[in-house]
């Protein structure tokens, strides 16, 4: 696997990123565990999820799958898509973004994303 710097940071990420859009929806936990394991065995160290993937269930699953191996992965997530019916669910105020980032960290069971 080839690696590149993530932007101007010192982080080195695999050229392939494991996307988890279907985790917890069309991909169950056991199959997702096999996918993550296979990717890691082949040098993938970059995994991507989002708050809206399966309405947060993908983030929760990714957190469970990476327990005990968090230092082996560069984790990315995203916010910005509508997660509920409240009037300000899809706004980009500082308060909203920070709230959604905190919610993602809680679902992931992590202190930070990369």
Write out the residue ranges for each language-model feature.
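Glycine/proline-rich, positively charged
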Residues: 27, 84-114
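Generic beta-strand or strand-like secondary-structure segments
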Residues: 61-65, 78, 96-103
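Short C-terminal domain-edge/linker segments immediately following a structured domain
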Residues: 46-50, 77-79, 106-109
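Structural motif corresponding to the early beta-alpha repeats
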Residues: 68-94
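N-terminal binding-site loop/beta-alpha segment at the start of enzyme catalytic domains
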Residues: 1-74
